[in-house]
Amino acid sequence: MDTIVFGTPQKPTASITPFRSLVRITSPAVEPVSLAFAKQHCRVDTDADDLYIQSLISVARQYVEDVLDITICSTVWEVKYDLFPVWAIVLPRLPMLDRAVTVTYRSGDGTYSQLSNATDFQVDASVLPGRIYPQWARSWPATRGDENSVTVRYSAGYGDDGQSAPPIVKHLILLLVAHWFDTRQPAVTGAPQSVPQTFDTLLAAASMGVYR
């Protein structure tokens, strides 16, 4: 998506703020692709492999999320930094949801404090990727500056069931499930197998480009 500045399209320049660690606090309540839909895609009519296919859906969803740096179904993430940036903290695992955000930091004396969304920082979940930044005429507080001095907890995803996720993303999951269901070894003797080119093409189309 281009940004219009004085009538001239400008390529977006935002990039994810480098972080120390990223942890998934909550797991999705449901998968964005149903078992029935996956079985239909794989052309499976029996129930014997239901548990296996369900596990493939979960693994495929995680793989697509990791590669594209996105969150499909609503998830709470916790990301840690060694210190605050100069201005905005651009958060990973887009799209950010307009839900509660907590920011905790360790000051120079080693004590922990929590910032207030009302007075200390603003949240912008309307852009990709989402970000937080200080309130008007304020700045981030000084931190101790050692590892994991800043912790941000926030929510991301395309809704609780992921149904509003781009269709191309859900189709990527289906392609992986079908491929893994049919090919259960890393390679087939005499005929090495890889994910079909169709998957790579869709993956490139779904990529967020400069945001990764």
Predicted features along the sequence, with ranges:
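Divalent metal-cofactor coordination and adjacent catalytic microenvironments
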Residues: M1-R212
